[in-house]
Design a protein with these regions (language model features):
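Conserved, single-site charged/polar hotspot
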Residues: 1-176
């Protein structure tokens, strides 16, 4: 759908939480994600004011019913609502300001340095961290053989993520 839609803030937050993380994750992981979602949303409101337009993708209640099935909807929604309420008011701060808190479910075994990803020194707290269990996660590793004459990696960041690939005469950005 295009355009804007007014949604109660709590419903939007729970919908964002449902979109970003599986309701089957451990409760503490859900709580951590709730804090990240709240921080991101509050930061946007702080920057843009009360009429801020939220652009993060979220699940509507209808989406959640489709995702979980009608029979599991009430139980799962109540679980996310409880997690949201139990973390009420909790946000991530850095130097007295709401922090930018990018999220990814899995890495290639290391998180990335914020400066390398975002191109700015504005987020010095985003440092590389080893995450060895990420590479063991279900569905994380998949191999595909693609035959492309002359394809070669031209650059990688310090965590080993590919940031550039040359195919023939064209150089592609690994970030897009």
């Amino acid at each position: 759908e295009s355009g804007t839609k007014e949604v109660p803030l709590k419903e939007y937050c729970i919908g964002t939480l449902a979109k970003e993380i599986s309701v089957d994750f451990e409760e503490e992981a859900l709580k951590a994600q709730a804090v990240i979602v709240r921080t991101t949303i509050y930061k946007k409101i702080e920057e843009q004011g009360e009429k801020a337009v939220m652009t993060e993708r979220f699940f509507t209640k209808s989406d959640m019913k489709n995702q979980w099935g009608r029979s599991a909807f009430q139980k799962n929604y109540k679980k996310l609502e409880r997690v949201w309420n139990e973390t009420d008011g909790q946000v991530v701060m850095y130097n007295g300001q709401l922090a930018m808190v990018p999220f990814h479910q899995l890495s290639n075994g290391k998180t990335r340095i914020g400066k390398e990803v975002l191109g700015t020194d504005e987020y010095p707290y985003l440092q590389m961290k080893e995450c060895p269990k990420d590479v063991e996660a279900d569905g994380q590793m998949e191999s595909k053989l693609i035959k492309a004459a002359g394809a070669q990696i031209t650059s990688q960041d310090s965590a080993g993520y590919v940031t550039g690939v040359k195919v023939g005469e064209e150089t592609l950005n690994g970030e897009t």
